[in-house]
Regions:
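Helical substrate-recognition/capping region of FAD-dependent monooxygenase/halogenase enzymes
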Residues: 2-5, 9, 24-25, 78-81, ...
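Core Rossmann-like FAD-binding/catalytic domain of the broad FAD-dependent monooxygenase superfamily
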Residues: 1-381, 385, 474
């Protein structure tokens, strides 16, 4: 018998997401991190709308919205001339916008959530080595007291960054290369009069090539920005090599760190307004690689976040992609711990997330070289892709067939939000996302006529049996459908938004996965498809 259900190595945003999602499903976790305390650095800053949707489902959206600042767009300057402004516009039906939040605040909020779920982080404790057999993972930890501890876990999740012990222990390849560019980062205040809420990108270009660059991302606080810029020669780490050959991330501890004078020198060259930098909170040199593992796990061990993929920070994709890795994996591991994982459920983590990791690595590398404005396609689609709202799992072995949707999202697509849903005893409408905050699958049964209500009851009963009771069910009724005898929880689609957002047909079943993606659509709702699908996912 294992000492713990899941051991998580690394307590950054990815590890904390995995731990919180497992703990709130009753899975016993240990979360270890080699650092004695959280780093007070604004490393990852951009928070994508899809991540905010995840935080809504996890139960920390209010805290995030109170702490973050909105990102309205980006101001572009080339050789001192202002270019076209990039507005971060999204369709009105998308519930959240782009935001900026320093990574240390993201980690604080996630760790607070973990504590509320009954978990904690063991700091100063590092994974040293591990081995697995068909039944358990045997791990060795180094302790802050100087000793070691041996333990067994049913599963191990490596969220331990670009130099991951878990990735190396699995023998995964990490193909890619380092980029020649080096950047220095600084968290400072400036006194310019540029509009609040906008990132700033100012470059110097000669013969079509950028030879100097300044990027400023707004942070919470008055005129406060996380600035990145080319590293001057006296701060370069170009000759330094990391022991494992992976050159990526902050390297301030390996040499002199940038001071205000270095940042001010770049501002004097590239700032679109004369300004003075003050109140330097931290600074470092940042080196970049692009790499991805050949697989996201093996047996009882998995990798997520920077342990699985690293790439340029353009578009704020890295942390957000890692959070989605963890969010995809956690519900599947929880099902396995509870003995309700069908064949292929855990394997679907690699099948679903690795193609997305490849796409993100390729796209961020392209943007680092040419900018987001060089992307083909219309700007609206580009913005939805950057917001991570177009990523999905069509064709996955654990979702239904594409083509089952009449006119709306297909199995594998993100489940969209909608408003105007009315409970009989509530005077105000609610949004669909409020129904999807549960920990299990949610089955939505749409009825546009009273004749379909009996089949909704039958569909719910059969689905709950197939899911071993681990299923939330709600009937969604067209505005004029009366259902006094319905035994299910029900809402009325008061503004017809659900029908339009989903292209829902009368008598249809829509199954939403715990990670907010559609698993199946089926008509009629009481046919064999839904129970069979749930049995496949969760075992018989």
């Amino acid at each position: 018998m294992a000492d713990v259900d899941v051991l998580i190595a690394g307590a950054g945003p990815v590890g904390l997401t995995a731990a919180s999602e497992l703990c709130r499903r009753g899975v016993a976790c240990r979360v270890v991190d080699r650092l004695p305390e959280r780093l007070p650095f604004a490393r990852a800053v951009g928070v994508q709308p899809r991540t905010l949707e995840i935080w809504d489902r996890m139960g920390m959206i209010r805290e995030a919205l109170e702490t973050a600042v909105p990102l309205k767009g980006q101001l572009l300057y080339v050789n001192g001339e202002e270019g076209p402004r990039i507005d971060l516009a999204l369709p009105p039906e998308v519930p959240y916008r782009f935001a900026a939040l320093p990574q240390y605040e993201t980690e604080r909020l996630l760790e607070d959530l973990l504590r509320r779920c009954g978990g904690e982080v063991e700091r100063g404790t590092a994974l040293v080595s591990f081995a697995q057999d068909p039944h358990v993972v045997r791990a060795v930890l180094s302790l802050p007291t100087g000793g070691t501890e041996e333990l067994t876990a049913r599963y191990l999740i490596g969220c331990d960054g670009a130099h991951s012990v878990v990735r190396k222990g699995l023998g995964l390849s990490f193909e890619g290369a380092a980029l020649p560019e080096e950047y220095m980062l600084g968290d400072v205040e400036v006194d310019w009069d540029l509009p609040a809420g906008y990132a700033v990108r100012s470059s110097h270009v000669v013969d079509g090539l950028t030879d100097d660059l300044l990027v400023c991302i707004p942070l919470p606080g008055d005129h406060r920005y996380r600035m990145s810029m080319a590293t001057p020669p006296e701060l370069s780490r170009a000759g330094q090599k990391d022991a494992d050959g992976v050159t990526h991330g902050l390297s301030g501890e390996q040499g002199p760190v940038p001071g205000l004078e270095h940042i001010q020198a770049v501002l004097d060259r590239l700032s679109p307004r004369p300004t003075t930098a003050t109140s330097l909170r931290w600074s470092s040199v940042f080196r970049i690689s692009h790499r991805i593992v050949d697989r996201y796990g093996h047996g009882r061990v998995f990798v997520a976040g920077d342990a699985a993929h690293i790439h340029p920070p353009t578009g704020a994709q890295g942390m957000n992609t890692g959070i989605q890795d963890a969010y995809n994996l956690a519900w599947k591991v929880a099902a396995a711990v509870r003995g309700h994982a069908g064949a292929g459920l855990l394997e679907s983590y690699d099948a679903e997330r690795r193609p997305i990791g490849e796409e993100v690595v390729d796209r961020t590398l392209r943007h680092a070289r040419s900018g987001i404005q060089a992307d083909p396609g219309d700007p609206a689609t580009t913005m939805l892709r950057e917001a991570q709202l177009l990523l999905g799992y069509r064709g996955s072995a654990i979702v239904g067939p594409v083509g089952s949707a009449h006119d709306g999202p297909e199995p594998g697509d993100r489940a969209p939000d909608c408003g105007g849903l009315l409970y009989a005893l509530r005077a105000f409408p609610v949004r669909l996302f409020s129904l999807l905050r549960e920990r299990e699958h949610t089955l939505l049964l749409y009825a546009d006529h009273e004749d379909q209500l009996a089949s909704s009851d039958r569909a719910a009963a059969a689905a709950v049996r197939a899911a071993h009771g681990m299923l939330n069910v709600c009937a969604v009724l067209a505005p004029r459908v009366s259902a006094p005898g319905l035994s299910l929880p029900a809402v009325h689609d008061g503004l017809d938004e659900f029908r339009r957002a989903y292209g829902a047909r009368g008598g249809e079943a829509v199954l939403v996965r715990p990670d907010g993606y559609l698993g199946l659509r089926a008509v009629p709702a009481d046919g064999p498809e839904v129970p069979a699908h749930l049995a496949m996912l969760l075992g018989t």
